[in-house]
């Protein structure tokens, strides 16, 4: 049964229109956030108003539990939130409460594919797990490890249902106790005691979609449970991605289907769109259309289930595993913030790169014109140096080095946002309404 606070939260979200299908995610950390003097949660608390003002609906927070690695991605004592390098449990709860007070949902970074043990067994292998509570919750032994993870297991568990994670024991998610106790832990994170609303599933390649479905259905996250499924794209002999990436996006769509499809909260990060954009903005914008005239990523097939992004803590930040061309980052945001799908803004770009105002302006255009994850897309131009698209008949956007695309802009549209290599137009009626709102707001001061 929902508590009064939870019911109030749901009502607030409905009033803010978040139930309409439009989500603006914000990744609220990077790879180095754990180093923050005074704690990352406290720093982020001071930025809540800026995040709210930008139209964000969901903030993705780092893994909250004790971890062998400082960033949180090698978790051990899952119930121990005070051992996090990002701050204390009370600081986390205060941050989530502040977000809720502004109508923003909090996404927990859920790392359950693998887990680090506290103690060695009689073989001298680290495979005795401590849950972080005085009782026996999540206190596991080697029989909770997949038997094909021979470095750690005792050979009695089930086979792994997904990809191997070599650095830590792969947990046996077919074990009933594992499923029940991890579900209970997630429900605890979602309860009033902590307050998370939704999930980001780390390394979801490590366990089957059917396993993910167990946790999603067992915890009913509010609005989304977005999976990280980062697989290699198809590359040509020139080292660039092949034009056709249908197999890559099909794997992402298949995962959504297998966790429950439309009826499920399951979603995926659109790594297909990310990979194509990385190359397209370097003078190959013809890549941004598929053979059917649609967007070439997951947003071209199932946009409601796609979370689009420019960079994250892995691809960008200090890891730089797959970075977006740094001089064209705003072209990436002009694309994802005007197109179908559920866009995610990266902390670094918003706060550290000085792009806050430009990104917020694009979000404002999106929200002012009612662009959502399922908006219609008409691609008007896809040349090497220019890409132009119309969204819902209300917004037109352009990215690329070509300056003049005026012949493609329909009559009755007004320039709403622009910067290096991008421009966005909206119908004059929307622009006038926005101006009237600003005028009336100023008059009331």
UniProtKB/Swiss-Prot annotation:
Family label: Belongs to the glycosyl hydrolase 13 family.
Q: Which UniProt keywords apply?
A: Calcium, Carbohydrate metabolism, Glycosidase, Hydrolase, Metal-binding, Signal
**Sites annotated Transition state stabilizer:** 314
Q: How is the cofactor bound?
A: Binds 3 Ca(2+) ions per subunit.
UniProt KW Calcium keyword: yes
What is the uppermost EC class here? hydrolase
Q: Does the keyword Transferase apply?
A: no
Single GO MF annotation: calcium ion binding
- The EC number(s) attached to this protein equal 3.2.1.1
User: What more is known?
Assistant: Binds starch not only at the active site, but also via accessory binding sites on the protein surface that are important for efficient binding to starch granules and thereby increase enzyme activity.
Binding-site residues, substrate: 66-68, 73-74, 200-205, 230, 232, 250, 257, 294, 300-302, 313, 319, 398, 403-405, 415-421, 425
Instruction: Provide the function of this protein.
Output: Important for breakdown of endosperm starch during germination.
What is known about its subunit structure? Monomer.
From the UniProt record, list the reaction(s) this protein catalyses. Endohydrolysis of (1->4)-alpha-D-glucosidic linkages in polysaccharides containing three or more (1->4)-alpha-linked D-glucose units
The domain of life is Eukaryota
Name the cofactor(s) required for activity, per the record: Ca(2+)
Residues annotated to bind Ca(2+) 3? 149, 164-165, 168, 170
**Which residues act catalytically here?**
202 (nucleophile), 228 (proton donor)
Signal sequence segment: 1-21
Q: Which residues bind Ca(2+) 2?
A: 130, 133, 135, 139
Output one GO BP term.
starch catabolic process
Record the organism. Oryza sativa subsp. japonica
Q: What is this protein called?
A: Alpha-amylase isozyme 2A
């Amino acid at each position: 049964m929902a508590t009064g606070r939870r019911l109030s939260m749901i009502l607030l979200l409905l009033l803010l229109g978040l139930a309409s299908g439009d989500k603006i995610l914000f990744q609220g950390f990077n790879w180095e956030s754990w180093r923050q003097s005074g704690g990352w949660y406290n720093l982020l608390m001071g930025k809540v108003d800026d995040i709210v003002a930008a139209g964000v609906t969901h903030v993705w927070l780092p893994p909250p539990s004790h971890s062998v690695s400082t960033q949180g991605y090698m978790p051990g004592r899952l119930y121990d939130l005070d051992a996090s390098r990002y701050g204390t449990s009370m600081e986390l709860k205060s941050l989530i409460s502040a977000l809720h007070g502004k109508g923003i949902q909090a996404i927990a970074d859920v790392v359950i594919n693998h887990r680090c043990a506290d103690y060695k067994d009689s073989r001298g292998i680290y495979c005795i797990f401590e849950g972080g509570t005085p009782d026996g919750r999540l206190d596991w032994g080697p029989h909770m490890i997949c038997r094909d993870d021979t470095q750690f297991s005792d050979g009695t568990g089930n086979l792994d249902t997904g990809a191997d994670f070599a650095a830590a024991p792969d947990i046996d998610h077919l074990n009933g106790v594992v499923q029940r106790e991890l579900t209970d832990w997630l429900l605890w994170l979602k309860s009033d005691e902590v307050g998370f609303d939704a999930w980001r599933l780390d390394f979801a390649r490590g366990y089957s979609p059917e396993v993910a479905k167990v946790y999603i259905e067992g915890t009913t996250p509010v609005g989304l449970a977005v999976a990280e499924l980062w697989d290699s794209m198809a590359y040509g002999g020139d080292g660039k991605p092949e034009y056709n990436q249908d197999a890559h996006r099909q794997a992402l769509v298949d995962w959504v289907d297998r966790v429950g499809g439309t009826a499920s909260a399951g979603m995926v990060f659109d790594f297909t769109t990310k990979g194509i954009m990385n190359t397209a903005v370097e003078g190959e914008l013809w890549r941004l259309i598929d053979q059917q005239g649609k967007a070439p990523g997951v947003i071209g097939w199932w946009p409601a289930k796609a979370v689009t992004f420019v960079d994250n803590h892995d691809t960008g930040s200090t890891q730089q595993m797959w970075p977006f061309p740094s001089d064209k980052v705003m072209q990436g945001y002009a694309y994802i913030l005007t197109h179908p799908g559920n866009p995610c803004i990266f902390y670094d770009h918003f706060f550290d790169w000085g792009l806050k105002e430009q990104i917020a302006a694009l979000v404002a255009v999106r929200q002012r014109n009612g662009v959502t994850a399922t908006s219609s897309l008409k691609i008007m131009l896809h040349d090497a140096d220019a890409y132009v698209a119309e969204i819902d008949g209300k917004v037109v956007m352009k990215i690329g080095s070509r300056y003049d695309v005026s012949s493609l802009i329909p009559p009755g549209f007004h320039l709403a946002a622009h910067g290096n290599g991008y421009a966005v137009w909206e119908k004059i009626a929307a622009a006038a309404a926005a101006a009237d709102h600003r005028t009336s707001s100023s008059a009331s001061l």
